[in-house]
């Protein structure tokens, strides 16, 4: 992963440098098209590794021992060990406002059969949630009103195998305002998080914009970083504006932010709630 991050990185920064080295943390902004491309190239060129595209229906069990996985087409792939990298796909539901649709992430289906299968084997499950911000068209942003934010002067790679990395793109910074917060509050009654529609627990250090407004009501603004998602795309990630509020509220809120007054939304923000299995069940 470190090698792939170094190879596809657009900007590299060390976080928390105002404090002691023990909490310094490397961060990279990566090209969303190049990273998976390089990952595929690596996997497909790895010896003794076979990559199969298929949907898994259940884990095959024989006399309380794993025998492999069974696909939706009925094919069994034999194995003495199975590692599930489920992400947000197990019984995933995507929310924008009060509308929920099945999905692991935008434009991709969720997996329901694996959760049922593991529950039938005696595993216990819970629900988690995370979210993502809107993406906007770079050509609709007024960059003249924004401050530019670059990477480190001497960026450090993640992998010891990488001799050096360089910053390719800069980001741009703006902030929300009290007007933005008032607009977003109008949609709180249709927030799946505040209404109880989403019961899953969210990430501790990456709250949604509505959560930040609610929890830190004394703050009159919150930082927004506009990050281009790749060298060959005009899609810009609105970092700091993760939300599951209704589309009209998202649009009105974004248009109240300096530099985004005329922004065109390419994809709306959404939350995803999904199953996870308690880690203390691992042996």
Explain the meaning of each model-derived region:
Residues 2, 8-12, 212-213, 224, ...:
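Flexible, glycine-rich loop/tail regions that form catalytic "lids" or insertion modules at the edges
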Residues 70-81, 86:
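Core beta-strand elements of the Rossmann-like FAD/NAD(P) dinucleotide-binding domain
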Residues 147-230:
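Long, low-complexity segments enriched in small/aliphatic residues
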């Amino acid at each position: 992963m470190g090698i792939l991050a170094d190879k596809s990185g657009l900007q590299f920064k060390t976080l928390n440098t105002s404090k002691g080295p023990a909490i310094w943390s490397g961060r990279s902004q990566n090209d969303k098209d190049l990273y998976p491309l390089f990952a595929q190239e690596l996997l497909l060129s790895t010896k003794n590794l076979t990559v199969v595209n298929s949907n898994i229906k259940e884990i095959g069990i024989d006399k309380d021992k794993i025998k492999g996985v069974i696909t939706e087409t009925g094919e069994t792939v034999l194995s003495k060990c199975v590692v599930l990298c489920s992400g947000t796909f197990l019984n995933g539901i995507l929310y924008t406002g009060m509308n929920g649709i099945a999905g692991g992430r935008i434009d991709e289906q969720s997996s329901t059969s694996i959760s049922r299968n593991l529950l039938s084997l005696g595993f216990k499950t819970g629900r988690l949630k995370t979210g993502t911000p809107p993406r906007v068209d770079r050509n609709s942003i007024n960059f003249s009103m924004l401050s530019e934010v670059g990477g480190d002067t001497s960026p450090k790679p993640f992998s010891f195998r990488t001799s050096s990395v360089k910053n390719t793109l800069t980001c741009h910074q703006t902030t929300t305002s009290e007007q933005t917060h008032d607009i977003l509050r109008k949609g709180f009654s249709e927030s799946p998080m505040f209404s109880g529609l989403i019961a899953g627990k969210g990430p501790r250090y990456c709250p949604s914009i509505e959560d930040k407004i609610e929890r830190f009501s004394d703050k009159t603004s919150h930082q927004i970083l506009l990050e281009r998602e790749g060298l060959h795309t005009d899609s810009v990630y609105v970092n700091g504006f993760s939300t599951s509020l209704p589309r009209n509220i998202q649009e009105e809120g974004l248009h109240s932010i300096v530099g985004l007054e005329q922004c065109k939304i390419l994809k709306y923000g959404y939350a995803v709630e999904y199953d996870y299995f308690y880690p203390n069940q691992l042996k």
